[in-house]
Amino acid sequence: MTIGIDKISFFVPPYYIDMTALAEARNVDPGKFHIGIGQDQMAVNPISQDIVTFAANAAEAILTKEDKEAIDMVIVGTESSIDESKAAAVVLHRLMGIQPFARSFEIKEACYGATAGLQLAKNHVALHPDKKVLVVAADIAKYGLNSGGEPTQGAGAVAMLVASEPRILALKEDNVMLTQDIYDFWRPTGHPYPMVDGPLSNETYIQSFAQVWDEHKKRTGLDFADYDALAFHIPYTKMGKKALLAKISDQTEAEQERILARYEESIIYSRRVGNLYTGSLYLGLISLLENATTLTAGNQIGLFSYGSGAVAEFFTGELVAGYQNHLQKETHLALLDNRTELSIAEYEAMFAETLDTDIDQTLEDELKYSISAINNTVRSYRN
């Protein structure tokens, strides 16, 4: 029996800014954003849209009535939680109409949370092959206007349905995990924006990949030649490339070109969205599968997950025969192409708005599953 990703999709808010416009507004060379960090556009959301909004829209795109009857676990990986006690997964469970006899909860460990959820889902299905698990990575990455992290913001969600005999990616049992207590990125309770040690975070990311890769190679004997593509956590698209370049310098030029060509296919969507935190690796996986022209059934895909603080994991998936028939490339391209571009003034005004849940209010938004009202601090969603 194989277990893995049976369905996968993503959702981003209907607004974005162009990175050239942001660079000009911040008196920065546009090349620093387009080339230096590798970003072209950045997703932006109004206060009427939160992680539940994104999670519900992403999940709705992949779930059938039969899926909702088979799902007995709903997991949301996030570091943008809307409540200190109640899990967004509980609200998502109701909005999706999933059968009631299910577990629903959140997982937090920076950008790693959804990977923890995916592995937990895999283990659950191994024990209950007739059941399915909905795993959603949903986040809003915000660092503040005019901050160093401003060009690496973003928002959205990735939804994955984990099942036995998956139709897209079968997960292997070769995981290598790494935990280190490092303050490279953190957000103390009550702080609206994270604290970031940029140089340390970059260094820890690169070092973490090197450690789990070397340990994985030691345990399995697998090297780059055994992988048809690698997908990385992508806080910005140059980050994964830095870690990759540090490890492939001893490979032949042809091998380096092969590996980097697949990497470029994995970052196409992220260049247009920005940082999805927990969803970044899986947005990269979707981009790889929907844009790579050389992948085929049986190919081995290596996945590197990283969450600051810091937890990292490397694991492998094998592409299933006919996987291309279960992707949603046209839908995803339409989602990205039909967004509204905001001027920098509009973006700054939207960014400056805050949702005061202590004030009863109604909110106007045409997007399905957006917040319709706040009553006694409780959020109501359109559906």
Swiss-Prot record:
Keyword Transferase among UniProt keywords: yes
Family membership noted in the UniProt record: Belongs to the thiolase-like superfamily. HMG-CoA synthase family.
Alphabetical list of NCBIfam families matching this protein: HMG-CoA-S_prok (TIGR01835)
Activity response to pH changes: Optimum pH is about 9.8.
EC number in record: 2.3.3.10
GO biological process: acetyl-CoA metabolic process; isoprenoid biosynthetic process
Residue sites binding (3S)-3-hydroxy-3-methylglutaryl-CoA per the record: D29, C111, T152, S201, H233, K242, N275, S308
Pathway of action: Metabolic intermediate biosynthesis; (R)-mevalonate biosynthesis; (R)-mevalonate from acetyl-CoA: step 2/3
Domain of life where this protein originates: Bacteria
Alphabetical list of InterPro entries matching this protein: HMG_CoA_synt_C_dom, HMG_CoA_synth_N, HMG_CoA_synthase_prok, Thiolase-like
Name of the protein in its database record: Hydroxymethylglutaryl-CoA synthase
UniProt key word Acyltransferase: yes
